[in-house]
């Protein structure tokens, strides 16, 4: 009896995930032919609350991209892989305390902020570098226009995804 209830709950969860995935995919299916441009996949995945690295995104796309013609992703290939990623809670965003520690490493003087120039340097020259577009998007959300700095505690609070 309890097993039946669990199975029904799982089926309901999967159905709900499929609807969310379909809704997100359809936003980018401009031809209404169940395909999207491969360049939109990262946006779709992130709109579903996932935060893959560029490497993880590349692997995800390699698993589902059409062989001929390349550059497109079919919904039928996308939905099982995306469903599995959501069920397994892959590509979770970093926790607030981890983000704070990362910013504190970049701020050895413990000022509580980084200048715009410091932020741009770190985000475009270190680790997995941001693209120009990603950097502009981050700056528009993060930088205080009056001081030209980012108060990283405020920024982290604003950016952290609520898991509930």
Swiss-Prot record:
The gene is Efcab2. Keywords: Cell projection, Cilium, Cytoplasm, Cytoskeleton, Flagellum, Repeat. Belongs to the DRC8 family. Component of the nexin-dynein regulatory complex (N-DRC), a key regulator of ciliary/flagellar motility which maintains the alignment and integrity of the distal axoneme and regulates microtubule sliding in motile axonemes. Component of the nexin-dynein regulatory complex (N-DRC). PANTHER family: DYNEIN REGULATORY COMPLEX PROTEIN 8. It is found in: Cytoplasm, Cytoskeleton, Flagellum axoneme. It comes from the Eukaryota. Its main location: cytoplasm. GO terms for cellular component: cytoplasm; cytoskeleton; sperm principal piece. Residues 16-51, 94-129 form the EF-hand domain. Coiled coil: none annotated. Gene3D superfamilies: EF-hand. Pfam families: EF-hand_7. GO terms for molecular function: calcium ion binding. InterPro entries: EF-hand-dom_pair, EF_hand_dom. This is Dynein regulatory complex protein 8.
């Amino acid at each position: 009896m309890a097993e039946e209830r669990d199975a029904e709950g799982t089926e309901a969860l999967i159905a709900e995930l499929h609807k969310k995935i379909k809704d997100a995919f359809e936003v980018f299916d401009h031809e209404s032919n169940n395909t999207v441009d491969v360049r939109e996949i990262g946006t779709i995945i992130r709109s579903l609350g996932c935060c893959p690295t560029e490497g993880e995104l590349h692997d995800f796309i390699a698993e589902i991209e059409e062989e001929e013609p390349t550059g497109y992703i079919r919904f039928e290939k996308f939905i099982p892989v995306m469903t599995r990623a959501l069920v397994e809670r892959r590509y979770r965003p970093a926790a607030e305390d981890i983000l704070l520690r990362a910013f504190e490493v970049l701020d050895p003087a413990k000022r509580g902020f980084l200048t715009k120039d410091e932020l741009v340097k770190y985000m475009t020259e270190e680790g997995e570098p941001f693209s120009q577009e990603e950097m502009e998007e981050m700056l528009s959300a993060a930088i205080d226009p009056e001081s030209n700095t980012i108060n990283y505690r405020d920024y982290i609070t604003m950016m952290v995804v609520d898991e509930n």
